[in-house]
Amino acid sequence: MDVLYSLSKTLKDARDKIVEGTLYSNVSDLIQQFNQMIITMNGNEFQTGGIGNLPIRNWNFDFGLLGTTLLNLDANYVETARNTIDYFVDFVDNVCMDEMVRESQRNGIAPQSDSLRKLSGLKFKRINFDNSSEYIENWNLQNRRQRTGFTFHKPNIFPYSASFTLNRSQPAHDNLMGTMWLNAGSEIQVAGFDYSCAINAPANTQQFEHIVQLRRVLTTATITLLPDAERFSFPRVINSADGATTWYFNPVILRPNNVEVEFLLNGQIINTYQARFGTIIARNFDTIRLSFQLMRPPNMTPAVAALFPNAQPFEHHATVGLTLRIESAVCESVLADASETMLANVTSVRQEYAIPVGPVFPPGMNWTDLITNYSPSREDNLQRVFTVASIRSMLVK
């Protein structure tokens, strides 16, 4: 894997810097590395593809070295270099695709394609000169079963979940109380509602709670907490739990009271915040517990009192909500996030070449399914294919 990365890094630098008019002295070190790559690869044969509709391709390496010059690089020099670069780039691209479409239930962190296994041989280590990629660094750690750490921005840690629970219900669905939520990606939005605006509740207050368990532990997380849930701030028609009917939700938004968010690890509270909004942090956690209250306003203008009558019908429904958004965090496991295209890169290649469903990944690389059942086998394979996707993205956009 590290050899594949160094190949890609050398080719990217060569493609960017070996251009007509450049002083040879400015790229002499790069050309030496480029020639070392050619010397190492010459005389070797590889085969890629042969799975799904990914075509079989044979690769043979027999290229001349780039020479030295005291002057600027001319058009002939650059054209010779370009022909070599283009062939190598095509080769790396196909090795990456061949690796991204393969999976294994055992030792999925190790190379799975014949071409990448061959590149892992000792003689190709002479190519290796740069392991500065976070993915490569973590792949090497995971390969040795040592602690890894990926930094993510808006990590897709929450499987998609959108539903509701009713703490008070009746067949007519005209005086409901409960919670509804939407968890997806890096965000939780949860709302508590009471059609009667807590008129018969103790101290005219309703208590709500929402608990979310993560599939992986996050550390050093920067989080935004807001006293609102905008996705539940407009009227909607909702299917009943049994699917037999629908009910109407017409929210009027109040500010939540006694808001508390707890971050827990293995059942132990690590961080707690009370009535604190904006940016907060959590050291390490695998569970988030949100609790908040809906309090009937003790003093209301006539206009507000008209919204919340003392008896049915309740045409407007008192609602309070919270939004929790993970802006950045560190995780030992690889995840999809907002700043990278690895999941899309892997999925698009697998779809384009009609790769059959294997023993590890769900059909279509469905992320909700994948993260919900994030087994060690999936973790190993996902880290490998994401690492390869990061290498491919250096050369192919």
UniProtKB/Swiss-Prot annotation:
InterPro entries to which the protein is assigned, alphabetical: Capsid_hemagglutn, Rotavirus_A/C_VP6, Virus_capsid_a-hlx_vir
Keywords: Calcium, Capsid protein, Intermediate capsid protein, Metal-binding, Ubl conjugation, Virion, Zinc
GO molecular function, one term: host cell surface receptor binding
Subcellular compartments: Virion
Tagged with keyword Repressor: no
Gene Ontology cellular-component terms listed: viral envelope; viral intermediate capsid
Interaction with the inner capsid protein VP2: annotated segments: 62-73
Binding-site residues, Zn(2+): H153
GO biological process, one term: fusion of virus membrane with host plasma membrane
Function, in words: Intermediate capsid protein that self assembles to form an icosahedral capsid with a T=13 symmetry, which consists of 230 trimers of VP6, with channels at each of its five-fold vertices. This capsid constitutes the middle concentric layer of the viral mature particle. The innermost VP2 capsid and the intermediate VP6 capsid remain intact following cell entry to protect the dsRNA from degradation and to prevent unfavorable antiviral responses in the host cell during all the replication cycle of the virus.
HAMAP family noted in UniProt: Rota_VP6, Rota_VP6_A
Family: Belongs to the rotavirus VP6 family.
Record protein name field: Intermediate capsid protein VP6
The organism of origin for this protein: Rotavirus A (strain RVA/Cow/United States/NCDV-Lincoln/1969/G6P6[1]) (RV-A)
Lineage of producing organism: Viruses, Riboviria, Orthornavirae, Duplornaviricota, Resentoviricetes
